[in-house]
Amino acid sequence: MKQLFEGSITKVHGIRVGQAQNDAAKTGVTVVLCSHDGAVMGADVRGAAPGTRETDLCKPENTVERVNAVVLSGGSAYGLDSASGVMRFLEEHGAGVDMGVCKVPIVPAAVLFDLKVGDAHVRPDAAMGYEACEKAGKEVRQGSFGAGAGATVGKLIPGTVPAPSGVGTASITLGCGVTVGAIVAV
């Protein structure tokens, strides 16, 4: 199969990606870390039961214009806890919106339902989110890694066997020199 877009979201200046997972439990987290000044983010929240945290901040009418990281996590609603570890990592590194008394890292998050794939009692948590930050770099493993560790598609139709899916990323550099990147967990 021919790739439509080569590259990854890390081709965008200042973007690094970290992934951590529990292979036995088939769940994990993918973290997109932005440069120290943050980045403008857009989100399209879909699905019959979306699980998100702070994605409303990304709407253009809101006052927060930049995010410091984005979390994609397995574990359904439990996986939102992984964003707390990302916030701790960013706070330790001085990133966030300066509120005068402290900096508050802005970390939108979205989750996948992977509880029926591996061990439903092992979920991405703050420690796994922090670990993903520590592993952040320019290489992004695609497929069943990080948030994609237990990702599947085809679960809505009774009697069908879900198929493995995962994390994917791509980027394109436009003629004007601007690079646009994306990352998804499906």
Which residue ranges define each predicted feature?
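Alpha/propeptide regions of enzymes that mature by internal proteolysis
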Residues: M1-V186
